[in-house]
């Protein structure tokens, strides 16, 4: 079974250490999201993002890494930049995550990015926070865009997440009717009220699989951020060892969905 982690901030550990950590838990490949982003401000105030770390990781370990591109929603050249995403080795998608400043999301300020993503076939990872109405409006308007809901759509108040396990999943399921929406099953153990292996969470995962189909769900660890709550191994093995999931479910959730949705073919 190929295991793909669809979000890691590998720049926080470095390339060699990231490879060692992946090997230790049994992860074959990972999608890098450089965080914090390396920004370059142009004279006109527009921000561009530097991918030197990810480019080096992909060049050195093309079978192990891909990465996420980011764009300034006000960049007048975003269409041209988006057109280059799929041409760059290892660059598979973009991400809308506003650093927990959701004003631009509420105001619909990502129209230019989403229009370009739809035009050029670039999947868009998006973290709704508590702005599900705004994200749903995007999903409806930009139906040619492949959206991926980050962090199972959980709210921003991490301390109260276990209180909202069922309601978080209920909210997530409202996206299932939109065929252009997939889900990143990341940070999910934070929702559990139980210790590893988080059986209450796995029961909720079964609901998500029934609603979306497992071919629209991909696992992510985000382990540099979730280390305050659970380990990298716990994030993975609560799924690998889950009796409620079939082997086919695990294959899709842990690898095949990421390959298919991100259009990231397995290297020969």
Predicted regions and their residues:
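Mid-domain alpha/beta scaffold segments of enzyme catalytic cores
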Residues: 1-112, 116-120, 184, 240
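Short, electropositive alpha-helical surface patch
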Residues: 59, 84-86, 154, 201-210, ...
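Acidic carboxylate-rich catalytic motifs and surrounding loops in phosphoryl-/glycosyl-chemistry enzymes
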Residues: 71, 187-188, 254-257
